[in-house]
């Protein structure tokens, strides 16, 4: 945390009761970057907003949104404030957004796993997630 952010946090702590501050600190410690969610080319923004809300609910800190044909617009009535607590990275260059996102995730040490409706693929329950960080693409 930068000095400016640290000083701001210290200043703002004066205005929060200890019980609330302890709750925030507890919840922050329960967040995970071991699992991240990747949403590729989702047609309806409310589906992304609902996914962000679910990520927040499960303690997932990072959500990656890949825009190829569809542009993400947060639906605040669906995300219900979760977008303020979950870090969102949007890949929206002119081309190769999926490839760029996958490369970044792999460079960051994630095993990339794509959800697929095919029967011949492996079952999600067979994937070992305790050792390596995983990025689930939907």
Regions found by a protein language model. Give the residues of each.
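Post-transcriptional modification and biogenesis factors for structured RNAs
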Residues: 1-138
């Amino acid at each position: 945390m930068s000095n400016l952010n640290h000083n701001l946090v210290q200043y703002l702590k004066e205005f929060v009761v200890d019980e609330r501050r302890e709750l925030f600190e507890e919840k922050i410690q329960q967040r995970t970057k071991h699992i991240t969610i990747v949403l590729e080319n989702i047609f309806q923004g409310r589906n992304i907003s609902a996914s962000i809300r679910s990520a927040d609910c499960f303690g997932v800190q990072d959500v990656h949104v890949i825009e190829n044909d569809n542009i993400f617009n947060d639906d605040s009535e669906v995300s219900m404030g979760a977008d303020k607590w979950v870090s969102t990275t949007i890949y929206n260059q002119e081309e190769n957004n999926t490839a760029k996102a996958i490369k970044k995730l792999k460079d960051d040490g994630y095993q990339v796993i794509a959800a697929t409706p095919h029967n011949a693929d492996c079952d999600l329950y067979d994937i070992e997630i305790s050792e390596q960080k995983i990025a689930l693409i939907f």
